Regions:
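Active-site proximal helix-loop segment of RNase H-like, two-metal nucleases, encompassing DDE(D)
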Residues: 138, 146-165, 178-182
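Acidic/histidine-rich, metal-coordinating catalytic segments
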Residues: 97-111
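Short catalytic/ligand-binding loop motif for oxyanion handling, primarily in non-cytosolic enzymes
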Residues: 27-29, 109-112, 142-145
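Mobile genetic element proteins and their domesticated derivatives, centered on retroelements
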Residues: 20-22, 61, 67, 86, ...
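Extended, low-complexity cationic-aromatic segments
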Residues: 1-87
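Short, basic/hydrophobic alpha-helical segments
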Residues: 81-101
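Short, conserved catalytic or adaptor-binding loops enriched in Gly and charged residues
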Residues: 122-128
């Protein structure tokens, strides 16, 4: 626990960002009947019946001190999906970082073996040379800021019926601003 708290106390360093990572499953639900649109004084009305359309997974990475959030929607939550998400962070979001310090829970997909099972040994070593994992202790997921961000996203944009992965993937769903804390 103190390892995580010590990281949070460090000053912001763009060359050594602290990035919280987590994921959330999302059940895809469609409307059995068309909803009644909202009008002045009345909210949108939905029928209680729905159609199950499968599930999806939302990966979330949050760099609180820089005010950044990255999301990726996948059909499943596998070791490969996690490794590809982290590779994208390393290559596209933090290409100039010396090391990305990732705070994650102890889920089995959040381990180093995910990279070796997904990529060639050289590629896995390249990615892992740029990241440093810090794991939250058991029963301490509240230490991971990505958990809090997922809750905010749930309340503000995904805590409603979403019937397909394309709608869920739409970046406009994830427009809640992150305020930099330094």
């Amino acid at each position: 626990m103190y390892d995580i708290l010590d990281l949070y106390e460090e000053p912001y360093d763009p060359k050594r960002p602290i990035v919280n990572v987590d994921e959330k499953p999302k059940q895809l639900l469609g409307d059995k009947r068309k909803s009644i649109p909202m009008r002045p004084g009345c909210s949108e009305k939905y029928d209680y019946e729905y159609i199950r359309k499968g599930t999806a997974n939302i990966f979330v990475a949050v760099e609180i001190k820089a005010g950044k959030r990255f999301t990726q929607v996948t059909k499943r939550r596998t070791m490969k999906d996690f490794a590809v998400f982290i590779q994208k962070l390393v290559d596209e979001e933090y290409p100039d970082a010396e090391v990305i310090r990732i705070i994650a829970d102890n889920l089995n997909t959040h381990k180093i073996k995910s990279f070796y099972k997904t990529f060639s040994e050289d590629e896995a070593n390249r990615i892992l040379s740029k990241i440093e994992f810090h794991y939250t202790p058991k029963h301490s997921s509240w230490l991971n800021a990505a958990e809090i961000e997922i809750n905010i996203m749930d309340v503000e944009c995904i805590g409603r019926r979403i019937g397909d992965i394309e709608t869920l993937s739409d970046r406009n769903l994830f427009t809640h601003p992150i305020y930099a804390v330094r």
